[in-house]
Amino acid sequence: MDKKTRRNVTRCIRKIIVRYIISTIGKAKNSDEDMITHKYLKRIKNIELKQYEVKTNNPEKKLEEEALKLINTTPKNGKLILLDEKGQNLSSTDLAKIILNWRDNNVTDINFAIGGAFGNGEKIKNTADKIIAFGKLTWPHQMVKMMVAEQIYRIETIIQG
């Protein structure tokens, strides 16, 4: 059996289930965007939403504390995808291929991290396994959270065929 066939057989025998995490900085709000986000969360198996608040007025300290919360949400052997306006623009199919590759390499946890109002500090940018953007526009955090949930749903649909 050649290497490619063995890999396909292994993939079929051992379906790794990926647990998704959406971790975000900011207060939970009862907004229309949150309602849509929760509709997508109900459609996706193995997903968690974690929201954190950092209460300090010092921007540098805030960035550092936010980074630690988002980084620490990623399990030890998981992958961290950071949403950042300067990140790489990917198609849904490209992102699905990245996640499928990670899954095929036994990654079971993927954390999509959304920073706070001051953006993302260097610590989390240096720690992230992938930095992506939803275009060059700046989006409200509530909308980004909703868009991430939708993309995870879309990725799972692409992967399942």
Segment roles from a protein language model:
Residues 17-44:
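N-terminal beta1-alpha1 ligand-phosphate binding loop
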Residues 28, 85-88, 116-119:
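Short glycine-rich anion-binding loops that position phosphate/pyrophosphate groups of nucleotides
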Residues 19-23, 50, 111:
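A structural signal for isolated positions on well-ordered beta-strands in alpha/beta enzyme cores
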Residues 3-17:
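Short, Lys/Arg-enriched N-terminal segments with co-localized hydrophobic residues
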Residues 22, 81, 115, 148:
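Conserved RecA-like P-loop NTPase ATPase core
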